[in-house]
Design a protein with these regions (language model features):
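Conserved C-terminal portion of the radical SAM core fold
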Residues: 1-38, 47-77
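Active-site-facing alpha/beta catalytic cores
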Residues: 67-93
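Flexible loop/turn segments at secondary-structure boundaries
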Residues: 2-4, 32-36, 80-82, 148-150, ...
Length: 208
């Protein structure tokens, strides 16, 4: 914020637009922890995140029209913070920056939609929900705060009869604006899960 956004971001986008050999540009919001005092804000307000999306969009559209590729890729955090739908999978150009947090949400949404439309795949989920009900058990699914609403929407669409609940864990260890699932720490998960976990199955992210 106030460094490489606004007019400065536009200059960066213009610089890349004039250099076609740059095949993919990642635009990522500043992340900061509580263990410093230089930075105190980023793009966590919806309006500020949306402003970046709006600034980059014309460049994406022009490049797709000219070359069939997007090139200018916004980190998932911008769409999550603006509470807006990310672009379709095609616009991620094969997800070259997936592990930089660019396109993970779109990939998840598409996989979730495929699962929810597949009656055969939903069968085992219904069966598992019935077993949980018979045993008086529930599932707690751990998520970071940034993507918790996306995961909640998915879980609410599953035929699990209210047996699955999403727990959005605040990142107190790093603090600041760190809120992605991949940077969760065990100390925060343990501190924020219910003390009584009897008859409870806890599902942890595979990366944290």
């Amino acid at each position: 914020p106030n460094e490489n956004d606004g007019e400065e971001l536009v200059r960066t986008l213009d610089f890349v637009e004039a250099r076609p050999l740059i095949t993919s540009l990642g635009i990522v919001p500043l992340g900061f922890t509580r263990h410093q005092d230089t930075f105190t804000e980023s793009f966590n307000e919806p309006a500020r995140a949306q402003a970046v999306i709006d600034a980059v969009r014309p460049y994406q559209l022009r490049n797709r029209k000219a070359t069939g590729r997007t090139r200018y890729q916004l980190a998932d955090e911008f769409y999550l913070m603006a509470r807006t739908e990310p672009p379709c999978a095609e616009e991620y150009d094969g997800y070259p920056q997936y592990y930089d947090g660019i396109g993970m949400v779109r990939s998840f949404l598409d996989e979730a939609a495929d699962l929810l439309a597949d009656e055969e795949a939903l069968g085992p989920i219904r069966a598992a929900a019935q077993r949980l009900e018979m045993a008086g058990e529930r599932v707690l699914l751990v998520s970071g705060c940034a993507s918790a609403h996306v995961v909640c929407d998915f879980v609410s669409a599953l035929p699990v009869g209210g047996r699955c609940e999403v727990v959005a864990v605040e990142n107190d260890y790093f603090g600041g604006n760190v809120n992605v699932t991949g940077l969760l720490c065990a100390c925060d998960v343990l501190a924020q899960l219910p003390q009584d976990l009897s008859h409870t199955v806890v599902w942890l992210p595979d990366i944290m």
